[in-house]
UniProtKB/Swiss-Prot annotation:
Family: Belongs to the gliadin/glutenin family.
GO CC term, one of those recorded: aleurone grain
Species for this entry: Avena sativa
Record protein name field: Avenin-E
UniProt region (3 X 7 AA tandem repeats of P-F-V-Q-Q-Q-Q), positions on chain: 21-41
Oligomeric form and interacting partners: Monomer.
GO terms of molecular function: nutrient reservoir activity
Xref: InterPro entries: Bifun_inhib/LTP/seed_sf, Bifunc_inhib/LTP/seed_store, Glia_glutenin
Main location: other
One Pfam family from the record: Gliadin
Location in or out of the cell: Vacuole, Aleurone grain
Amino acid sequence: TTTVQYNPSEQYQPYPEQQEPFVQQQPFVQQQQQPFVQQQQMFLQPLLQQQLNPCKQFLVQQCSPVAVVPFLRSQILRQAICQVARQQCCRQLAQIPEQLRCPAIHSVVQAIILQQQQQQQFFQPQLQQQVFQPQLQQVFNQPQQQAQFEGMRAFALQALPAMCDVYVPPQCPVATAPLGGF
């Protein structure tokens, strides 16, 4: 006679577990419609912005007519800062692959505008916001900010490549990208 010994390590399941039907999330075809370059930009934008920090510095430090700085520095100090920022900016811009230079410059301008917006909001007296309707104010500010952004972007796309003697493709794929913060 054979005796069946109960082994506690073996687990007996009276019924096989019901497997949930596999739920397809999104068909892969939809994802492919987005151009590869755009996908690259989404991942690389923070990286590019960091890499082009000297260019941001250059544009903000009143090294160019487009920059607006609330306080004045001595001319010599500013020239020295601008020269260093310019050299670093050009070095970094040259290292960025050609097809990514335009989105890189775009993201730098975006960062400058957002920074300026935050500064304006910070310095804006609270009393003024209570007197005027905030919704009304936003409606009037938006086209102005969009125009400011477009102006600075157009300037940066001309000035930086010319100054650094690097090629930036004339077709900028991110020209219609909405600006964050609106």
